[in-house]
């Protein structure tokens, strides 16, 4: 809810698919109060991984022993496991956000 996707074709000038025609989508937010960007992003990643398993991969860690970039953004390694349902990841993220909101209350000045 709150977003419309339309097909998009482009040719990247850099990175893995530089110079190759690629298909994707343009996301247009129609209702900023209804769209949930984190949930949408994770659901899209899960769908892409499901539809194109041979082509889907996470960017590798920048340094050996480090976490992949997406895991760093997420704050944990849950999404690296292909069997981890998006709904479980989102529930975990909601619990962590609620815990953070409670902890930060002590630091509010007004």
Where does each model-flagged region fall?
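Structural signal for terminal/edge beta-strands and the immediately following C-terminal loop/tail
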Residues: 97-110
